[in-house]
Amino acid sequence: MSSSWGGPIRISVFGESHGEAIGVVLDNLPAGEPIDPQEIMVQMERREEDLPQVVSGLLHGKTTGTPLCALIRNKDTHSSDYDKIKSLPRPGHADYTGFVRYGGNADPRGGGHFSGRLTAPLVFAGALAQLYLQTR
């Protein structure tokens, strides 16, 4: 399973539910596209209290043409809740799939890279795409 998708514009998600952060990288965005953070937050507020921090690819409210990377810091995680079940795959979750795919090295806490939290970076990417398409 890849964590990257797309053609002309590539989207890559990264991070784990109980890691330091999750995020998204959008590659090949056109340079000079205006980005309104308030418009993005309208979509992000539909998620938890996820506040994206753009760390590259944006300058003075416009895309630079280089990869745009947004981080969402994980907070209020309770990783110790998973200590007792770390070797027991949960039904209806991707624990076993992650174990097999990554040779037992996947982070199972909170679902790891397969957590529903990884939809937050996709919401950010979708909000960015929506802004772009509205100008076309």
Task: Describe the predicted segments one by one.
Residues M1-R136:
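Generic N-terminal targeting/processing segments that precede catalytic cores or assembly contacts
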